[in-house]
A protein has these predicted regions:
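Conserved NAD(P)H cofactor-binding loop of Rossmann-fold oxidoreductase domains
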Residues: 84-89
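A short, exposed helix-loop element centered on a Lys and neighboring polar residues
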Residues: 116-117
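Rossmann-fold cofactor-recognition segment
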Residues: 48-62
Length: 136
């Protein structure tokens, strides 16, 4: 991994949009930290691409922070984060299951918030991005 190589963290990297995004960035020469629940798929991707495997369930807030800390310790810095974790469970109106709907919201909404919370201090304090920094 070179000093000038761009580095990215992508969640949901084991399938769908997240996998396609991870593979595209890897092919373009970025060093990719890929996260998803399915470690075995991430490990297979790591064999064929410039992707490092960081298993993670985004529903767990503490694990999001620990995973990002581990990525920073190994990558030194991160230039970009893309949070693609998501799940979908189509139902008809008479099949609505509140427990399943809560899980979908935990992954699709709160999972993103957990990841944003994990990276917010890093990106707000990232010196060379000070001029791009937003306000909260």
């Amino acid at each position: 991994m070179s000093e000038n190589q761009k580095k990215i963290w992508i969640t949901g990297a084991s399938s769908g949009i997240g996998k396609a995004v991870a593979e595209k960035f890897a092919k373009e020469g970025w060093q990719v930290a890929g996260s998803a629940r399915r470690k075995e798929i991430l490990d297979d991707m790591a064999k064929n691409h410039n992707i490092s495997s960081y298993p993670l369930d985004v529903v767990n807030e503490e694990d999001c922070s620990k995973t990002f800390d581990k990525i920073i310790s190994e990558f030194t810095n991160i230039d970009l984060c893309i949070f693609c974790s998501g799940t979908y469970d189509p139902k008809k109106e008479k099949e609505i299951n509140l427990k399943q709907n809560r899980f979908v919201m935990d992954v699709n909404y709160f999972g993103v918030l957990n990841c944003v919370k994990a990276v917010e201090i890093y990106f707000c304090n990232y010196l060379h991005l000070q001029h791009l920094r937003g306000k909260m």
